[in-house]
UniProtKB/Swiss-Prot annotation:
The keyword Transferase applies. Homodimer. This is Thymidine phosphorylase. It comes from Shewanella amazonensis (strain ATCC BAA-1098 / SB2B). HAMAP family: Thymid_phosp. PROSITE patterns: THYMID_PHOSPHORYLASE (PS00647). One of its GO terms (molecular function) is 1,4-alpha-oligoglucan phosphorylase activity. The lineage of its organism: Bacteria, Pseudomonadati, Pseudomonadota, Gammaproteobacteria, Alteromonadales. One of its GO terms (biological process) is pyrimidine nucleobase metabolic process. GO terms for cellular component: cytosol. Belongs to the thymidine/pyrimidine-nucleoside phosphorylase family. Keywords: Glycosyltransferase, Transferase.
Length: 443
């Protein structure tokens, strides 16, 4: 028998907790036998004294097992269950293409996603822009769509990882969100509860990233790779660039349009293509669907070019209640803003740098993101045709096109865009889309 206060005392004194102590405490978080004050105290003790990798693995698996863990064995799937998770960014629409692409190559992708908060957009909010699409289907429908389409992107159900819900809300209120140990357990407990064989992790770096520095992003990537593999799920983390908007746009309906255009080959933003391919190829290799990165990329290009990935996206949308002809006719279903107008720079030159976070917040200001959980969204608003770094800027090439519902909102967003993008006489150095891979064998 353990006492919560003795577990807190041990961690306060910078001692390592045993697997059994961690399991006891997580059970207490779940069944409310541990108080909010005790959870806050342990969170603060971990924040200051950290956890070993063994402690992180124990915390992650205990939180994963605090609710339902999905099991796909009964469906008789003829391929691996694989997924991707991103720490979040601006214009990060990768999931919408990557899920169908991986499914078209023989994987099964049960992607449980979140809503946006602050400057980062949420994958679920993008799907809410599609009329009829159920982001919270019954577990029977979720399993049916995963089996038949190969991919289903839905929201977290109430019976998955209840320990994380309670722990996270307390961390949020007590300034202990920024602990790498706790971030690792929070992210992975949710992902691993989906019953995955393999996971590719997208850890963002730069001015639109969740972690403040490259070093912090790298530390998180290493922690996630070590803990996920330690918990039995093959995982690689990629450090990818978020020093500019990833897609050409930011905003829910706008990003859905860009994702469909990417899948059908109408338009593929080169940066978005590179990061999507890197993550998706890693999923195929980890899942045993491709021999190596080059083999995986060949397979992925094939399913993009022959239309199979686009077809699977359509199958997922209709399977979850959306329009059957969405891929062909998205224009008649996606909402449009009443004001669609470019914003220009005050001088000519090159797009030199971008405070990506501020562009994400401009979308929030327009009504396309949340200031607090539960806020209603306007799916039509946002930014499109966002300039790329290094691009020439003059009176004919705008910084971006703003989609707004009022003149006042347009003006406020225009000020934010001008303030977030620096135009200079010199061109910036080109940065890679993918900085590095963190694989299990590298640790």
């Amino acid at each position: 028998m353990f006492l919560a206060q003795e577990i807190i005392r041990k961690k306060r004194n910078a001692e390592a907790l045993s697997k059994e102590e961690i399991q006891f405490f997580v059970k207490g978080i779940t069944d409310n036998s541990v108080s909010e004050g005790q959870i806050a105290a342990l969170g603060m003790a971990v924040y200051f004294n950290d956890m070993t990798m063994d402690e992180r693995i124990a915390l992650t698996t205990a939180m994963r097992d605090s609710g339902t863990v999905l099991n796909w064995d009964s469906l008789g799937l003829n391929g691996p269950v694989i997924d991707k998770h991103s720490t979040g960014g601006v214009g990060d629409v990768i999931s919408l293409m990557l899920g169908p692409m991986a499914a078209a190559c023989g994987g099964y992708v049960p992607m449980i996603s979140g809503r946006g908060l602050g400057h980062t957009g949420g994958t679920l909010d993008k799907f809410d822009a599609i009329p009829g699409y159920q982001t919270e289907p019954s577990s029977e429908l979720f399993r049916k769509v995963v089996k038949e389409a190969g991919v289903a992107i839905i929201g977290q159900t109430g019976d998955l990882v209840p320990a994380d819900k309670r722990f996270y809300s307390i961390r949020d209120n007590t300034a202990t969100v920024e602990s790498i140990s706790l971030i690792t357990a929070s992210i992975l407990s949710k992902k691993l509860a989906a019953g995955l064989d393999a996971l590719a992790m997208d850890v963002k770096v730069g001015s639109g990233a969740f972690m403040p520095t490259y070093e912090a992003s790298l530390e998180l990537a290493r922690s996630i790779t070590a803990v996920a593999n330690g918990a039995g799920t093959k995982t690689t983390a990629l450090l990818t660039d978020m020093n500019q908007v990833l897609a050409s746009c930011a905003g829910n309906a706008l990003e859905v349009k860009e994702a469909v255009d990417f899948l059908t080959g109408k338009y593929r933003n080169p940066r978005l293509y590179e990061v999507t391919m890197g993550l998706c190829a890693e999923m195929l290799v980890l899942g045993g669907l491709a021999a190596n990165d080059a083999d995986a990329r060949t397979k992925l290009n094939t399913v993009l070019d022959n239309g199979r990935a686009a077809e699977i996206f359509g199958k997922m949308v209709s399977g979850l209640g959306g329009p059957a002809d969405f891929v062909e006719s998205y224009d008649k279903y996606l909402p449009k803003a009443s004001i669609i107008r470019p914003v220009y720079a005050e001088r000519d030159g090159f797009a030199y740098s971008m405070v990506t976070r501020e562009l994400g917040l401009a979308v929030v200001t327009l009504g396309g993101g949340r200031r607090k959980p539960g806020d209603a969204l306007d799916y039509s608003v946002g930014l499109s045709n966002v300039c790329a770094l290094g691009q020439p800027i003059n009176k004919d090439t705008p910084l971006a096109v703003i989609h707004a519902q009022s003149e006042a909102a347009f003006e406020e967003a225009a000020r934010a865009v001008r303030g977030a993008i620096t135009v200079s006489d010199k061109q910036p150095e080109k940065t890679p889309e993918i900085y590095q891979y963190v694989r299990a064998e590298d640790l």
